[in-house]
Amino acid sequence: MGKETPAEKSLNLIRGRLCDPSYVFRPLSASSDSNYSKLKFIVSTSITEGCNNSMLLLGPRGSGKAAVLDLGVGDLLEQFPDSVSVIRLNGLLHSDDNCAFKEIAKQLCMEHHLLFSKMASFDDNSQFIIAMLRACGLAHKTIIFVLDEFDMFAQGKQRLLYSLLDAMQSVTSQAVVVGISSRLDADQLLEKRVRSRFSHRKFLFLPPSREELDGLFVHLLSLPADSGFPSGYVSRFNDKIKNLTSDTRFKDILKTLFNANSTVNSFLKFIFCAVSLMNLESGLLSLENFKAALSSMQRQPKLEAVRDCSVLELYLLVCMRRLEVKEQSSYNFISVMKEYKAIHDSFHTSDYYAQNVCLRAFEHLRERQVICYAENRGQSQTGEYRLQKLLISASELHQGMRSHACCPAILLKLLDH
Amino acid sequence: MASTPRAKTFKSPTKTPSNIYRKSYLSPSSTSHTPQTPETHTPLRRSARHVSRKIDLGNDPIDAPGNDPIEGMNLIRKRERAPRKPTTDVVPSKSKKTETPKKKKKIDSFTPVSPIRSETIKKTKKKKRVYYNKVEFDETEFEIGDDVYVKRREDSNSDEEEDPEIEDCQICFKSDTNIMIECDDCLGGFHLKCLKPPLKEVPEGDWICQFCEVKKSGQSQTLDLPKPPEGKKLARTMREKLLSGDLWAARIDKLWKEVDDGVYWIRARWYMIPEETVSGRQPHNLKRELYLTNDFADIEMECILRHCSVKCPKEFSKASNDGDDVFLCEYEYDVHWRSFKRLAELADGDSDSDQEWNGRKEEEVDDSDEEMELDDEVLKSKRGGLTSARGGANSRKGRFFGVEKVGMKLIPEHVRCHKQSELEKAKATLLLATRPKSLPCRSKEMEEITSFIKGSISDDQCLGRCMYIHGVPGTGKTISVLSVMKNLKAEVEEGSVSPYCFVEINGLKLASPENIYSVIYEALSGHRVGWKKALQCLNERFAEGKRIGKEDEKPCILLIDELDLLVTRNQSVLYNILDWPTKPNSKLVVLGIANTMDLPEKLLPRISSRMGIQRLCFGPYNHTQLQEIISTRLNGIDAFEKTAIEFASRKVAAISGDARRALEICRRAAEVADHRLNTNKSAKNQLVIMADVEAAIQEMFQAPHIQVMKSVSKLSKIFLTAMVHELYKTGMAETTFDRVATTVSSICLTNGEAFPGWDILLKIGCDLGECRIILCEPGEKHRLQKLQLNFPSDDVAFALKDNKDLPWLANYL
């Protein structure tokens, strides 16, 4: 083992950047109209002016809601180190009201070095939270409640939301309640009492534009000149990146990627795949790396399942399809075997197998989720008597069979008629 | 209300004062004699001093010759010396000079000498005490809650005779009837005419003398204060001694008299000057600022010198003619954790209603065992922090161990030094947490509630009754009831209404509906029990008429907010609560608040019949009322255009009539204006304009799904178009992924787009389902997955019709 090569160091550097949300979203938040500026302004207003606020961050998954909030809260923690404490809840973990109140009390105790008691009841915890809000308000401290997966808190009686928002309007406190949700109708889920107390500040996180993504691409992949890399390598690497961005084929690759998903998270995954495939000998990214990354991003698992079937499994799939064409919407293994026998008798195929071999092939198809049970009831029945459904469509089956290596020609003929 | 301190100089007795004090400490059983007037003074001199002091206490400017009172002076943190009558009484100067003691900044040495001795004495003997609310001592009245000067050491008595109430001018060293002005930096007093150049009027705002001004500008040349003439000693007022650490200030917490020896004691809560805290004097501290601590001590009343006046910031701003003994106290300092907290203003907090009815008693005999226990607790908390045996901070309701640890190590600078702009004042007053002084637009409803309650509890025949109050959220139901209860409490103190006890419960803050029994019982009796035991006790009280103490004879008013959450499967909770007022001698009045108008009709017949016919409806606010509500809050603050307020009022009145929503829109508009003015600092208009209100409304009522649909990926748009197309083709809202994929395939084939594949298309559909643009089953169903639009198809058509990248989408919509 020798010293780390510049290629490996650059690979680690770029991977570290891709996994750092603040590095990714800092340039996207530079504008004064951005959600980051608005968020930071509202929370800092709560800190400096001693008031309460509540807001809701909405956007598709992967658009940077939690990352931008962490960026803003991190900046405010640096600016006001003694005046801010953050309480984080997640709807997947704390959607139960008792659990949520206990978690808030626990985090408040940890933040202020108090002793937490697990035996406290719902009443004790809720009164404690109100007392802490009052004490922090008198001490000019702001508590930021981050409710991730906000729509999960909006189920049931919504006691947590009501208590937090009601405490913010009746107690002299400084608190900010931030809800984060990928459901765009999250505010419609609120009960009418909670909705009245919520301030309905909604910040929408939309995918960035092409220019912003191009700038982000260069920002993520350019090597800094003042680092420990050899200067010749840095200039070669950065020139390669610049040439890539102006290449027409690269633009087509990005266009295909963004046609399906244009969020930042998808873009980061794509770059991560490409960087992981970088040639460690030359230490440079090439167009082939991005092509391979696009292929891995655009996989079709159901199609690959059909392509990897055996010939007998293909026969069974064709038989199911023919049964559906005959308006027989539900079938089981016995019906499929009848159809298989009929095909054999009509066309005298040379590939005829016994029933137990066919049953094993049938179960193999179900394990790969090409077919599934039609209903969940009647589990006491044997496998061959339960109703089945074909999950792939006719065109998918057709496409898979055409790309199969050793598909008999008779099957294609059988599928068409 | 803080009154002008009644000042009186402590007169010297015939004997040596140190002898008397030493004697009283060594043998507390001996009776302390009232000090006598020294016989050496002539009657004429004593009479002249008495007359002079009487006039000075009045602060009457009419008696000042040749000085017209200045009308309409708006003084901020300015204390003008009232003109005083000249006195010919000259105090003879002492030949001995008292050494100035060193400042003691450590907390450990803060405890004064006197209280330690008194505590030691008190520990050894348990004595009977007579507690007072008011005591006259040395011809001065002292009351619980008063602020006083306290001696620091025994031998500080020698300075006592020299205490002038009137400060000398720092330039001519005379105190006369002319108006003086105080420097805000060195707190020195100056005659207006002694200044260079002389002032004709007291200027508004802050004022610094020329000596401090030169010092602050950092010039190498220092302008020295004039020195006093020879033979005249510069007299220090008590305020100066306190701020330099030679005296203490304290608040009287308790007053009592030992029965055996007749010695008067007080329980003192100490004040601290900023220099004595761990953080020292911080840059934003005012010269006259003190901190209230949580340090207590028992001292004899003879250690008290006289009154001073410690005020909260609002009263401090108005105190312009209150003399030299005025101080500011805004923060509380915890001597154990060395942290600061803002003092909770007493006007905000609601005091316990049970304590109010006790009223003020002249004297009360109390057992000293309880007092000793309290002292032990205080001493224990002085020595160390909390022990883990006490349990967690959140383990018991109403007693949170360690909450006092929550405090600032340093008071942040932006809180004290920041001057609020008009926009910030508007934002503060538009907060939902800000309580308005008056409640506009609900006078009729409040009168109805008042007459209902008064009719229920008047005289001695308390009728058990119920009232159901309903209305949509944000129409002022709860705040109206609380405002009525506050007014009634004031009337109880005046004596025109008989006392009652008031319990307020919120249905959404209970762990379960049955928990309401425990909460009611705890509020009435102070005991914590399970809900079954509580139900039994409440049944005994209300249904069977059993009463234990004298407190139970009072009527009980029960306010249940969010009443509809108490509905259980068999509705037994509501039945019990509404059945109790129908019993004779229950003396229970129930006020229920909920949002639904038809809640009684939904309940069981035997419950709705007990709820009675007393209904009160709070309708949604119309735009005139909303405008009045907002304008009342913004009274005196010039931050909004009138059209902006009207625009917000009309918008909210058209949608919901919710006062909370209207206030939030105006506050959000003020935030938008603040953000706009911060980024564009050259703007001349500082008001909230209509565009800001429009931006706030746009943000609050926006449809985010349309914006998201406009910005989704290309294939997502094609997917949505295919769904709309399927809807029109089949007429059914629900479709399957198989059909949508087939439609997408044909659309892509027709318009030259590459079909992505079924699996990628399935993922696109699941992503749209996660945003709830469409509703979909889990993706594992693949071809059989059921899909449905979550928003109207017109919204999809509106969002996708004008797309630039895909102009042909309009053909399918």
Swiss-Prot record, chain A:
Compartmental location: Nucleus
Induction remark: Regulated by E2F. Accumulates rapidly after cell cycle reactivation by sucrose addition following cell cycle arrest mediated by sucrose deprivation.
Expression across tissues: Follow a cell-cycle regulation with a peak at the G1/S-phase. Isoform AtORC4a is expressed at low levels ubiquitously. Isoform AtORC4b is mostly expressed in siliques, flowers and flower buds, and, to a lower exent, in roots, leaves and stems.
Keywords: ATP-binding, DNA replication, DNA-binding, Nucleotide-binding, Nucleus
Top-level taxon of origin: Eukaryota
One Gene Ontology cellular component: nuclear origin of replication recognition complex
UniProt signal peptide: none
Key word Secreted present: no
Biological processes, Gene Ontology terms: DNA replication initiation
PANTHER family: ORIGIN RECOGNITION COMPLEX SUBUNIT 4 (PTHR12087:SF0)
Function: Component of the origin recognition complex (ORC) that binds origins of replication. DNA-binding is ATP-dependent. The specific DNA sequences that define origins of replication have not been identified yet. ORC is required to assemble the pre-replication complex necessary to initiate DNA replication.
Entry's family note: Belongs to the ORC4 family.
Quaternary structure (record): Component of the origin recognition complex (ORC) composed of at least ORC1 (ORC1A or ORC1B), ORC2, ORC3, ORC4, ORC5 and ORC6. ORC is regulated in a cell-cycle and development dependent manner. It is sequentially assembled at the exit from anaphase of mitosis and disassembled as cells enter S phase. Interacts directly with ORC1A, ORC2, ORC3, ORC5 and ORC6.
Identification of the protein by name: Origin of replication complex subunit 4
Species whose genome carries this gene: Arabidopsis thaliana
Curated annotation (Swiss-Prot), chain B:
Recorded GO MF terms: ATP binding; ATP hydrolysis activity; chromatin binding; double-stranded methylated DNA binding; histone binding; zinc ion binding
Annotated region (Necessary and sufficient for ORC complex assembly), positions in chain: 436-803
Keywords tagged on the record: Activator, ATP-binding, DNA replication, DNA-binding, Magnesium, Metal-binding, Nucleotide-binding, Nucleus, Transcription, Transcription regulation, Zinc, Zinc-finger
Record domain BAH: where: 226-344
Region (Disordered): 1-109, 349-372
Function per UniProt: Essential protein required for ovules fertilization. Component of the origin recognition complex (ORC) that binds origins of replication. It has a role in both chromosomal replication and mating type transcriptional silencing. Binds to the ARS consensus sequence (ACS) of origins of replication. H3K4me3 effector that positively regulates the transcription of a subset of genes.
Protein name (record): Origin of replication complex subunit 1B
Species of origin: Arabidopsis thaliana
